[in-house]
Amino acid sequence: MSNRKADEKHHMSSSSLTNDRSYIRNLSNRKTSISRKVPITRTLEDPSNFVAKDGTKLVQAPLFLLVWQKEICLSIIAICFACLLSPSLRPYAEPFIFLSYKQPDGSYGKGPKDACFPIFWVIVFTAFRVIVMDYVFRPFVLNWGVRNRKVIIRFCEQGYSFFYYLCFWFLGLYIYRSSNYWSNEEKLFEDYPQYYMSPLFKAYYLIQLGFWLQQILVLHLEQRRADHWQMFAHHIVTCALIILSYGFNFLRVGNAILYIFDLSDYILSGGKMLKYLGFGKICDYLFGIFVASWVYSRHYLFSKILRVVVTNAPEIIGGFHLDVPNGYIFNKPIYIAFIILLFTLQLLIYIWFGMIVKVAYRVFSGEEATDSRSDDEGEDEEASSTNEDK
């Protein structure tokens, strides 16, 4: 009797797995039927990219969200813009699409409606990520001759990151360089409270928040890596710092830290893209530039900001003072919270620097620079997937 129950259980399990595979194959055919002439036909939204041979999911997000993320996000964006056409719905849609709290002099203040703007940009970035990966970077890497499916996915992911970090590093540099607190850490805390800002500064700050909120989602859309929890902690701390610095009127230090961190990020993403294209030697040289930029920006410049926060910030601001209607939101608990978040970020930086040192040692030993955080990009079911698609 027990053997018969075991056989029935095994049969039911096998049937369930077969049904899952059939669903994935049918959905894959619908999503990729337009590209049959390409040797690797699966688009980056194809469900087979997120499922192992035995039917196990390789990512944490629901399968339908991975497959239809572009369509879902574009539909939400279209609905928001359609609401602008309705006089009764327009007031509800405007905070998501446009900046709020414009002042008579052209500057912008702050308020609860500001929470809508970064939420909208989470949706925009999710759709933009899929579009730019699938219709810009994927055709490029295929035309380059790359046929390893995992390498194609990694190249497209890094291409999206490179594009974002490069654009917003230049934008952050422009805002930082044209300010009166450029290269002067003590001026980051002068003129407190920093309540009003230009439209460019406000858009930059809130869009950055939207990007980092979306990065938390991306962690669950991509295959988990070795440093998943470090990345998750980094994204949470980054979002908390952006929200607190914006809400408690410390805008300048937020601009400085975002600018500092974006520098090494776009160099790292660019180096990985070159590695996936086969430029091993150039990648090694670029890795040296990345290490130099990392040490300079995250261990030197960021440490200078930390020193001012710990030793001089309360004195520069004028002491602890809580007067919310007038924008003074700086008491001891808030100050301690900022210090804890900044030193948590510093701890993560040192953990990653330890990984960088390991890679640097391998490079000096004659090996190629490889990301110790990633899984093996060289092993893939390339042959079987190609045969299935022909």
Curated annotation (Swiss-Prot):
The chain crosses the membrane at residues 63-83, 117-137, 155-175, 199-219, 231-251, 276-296, 336-356. It is an enzyme of class 2 (transferase). It is found in: Endoplasmic reticulum membrane. It is a multi-pass membrane protein. One of its GO terms (cellular component) is endoplasmic reticulum. It catalyses: a fatty acyl-CoA + sphing-4-enine = an N-acylsphing-4-enine + CoA + H(+). The modification Phosphoserine is found at S372, S374. Its main location: endoplasmic reticulum. Pfam families: TRAM_LAG1_CLN8 (PF03798). Its EC number is 2.3.1.24. Keywords: Endoplasmic reticulum, Glycoprotein, Lipid biosynthesis, Lipid metabolism, Membrane, Phosphoprotein, Transferase, Transmembrane, Transmembrane helix. Component of the ceramide synthase complex required for C26-CoA-dependent ceramide synthesis. Facilitates ER-to-Golgi transport of GPI-anchored proteins. Involved in the aging process. Belongs to the sphingosine N-acyltransferase family. This is Sphingosine N-acyltransferase lag1. The gene is lag1.
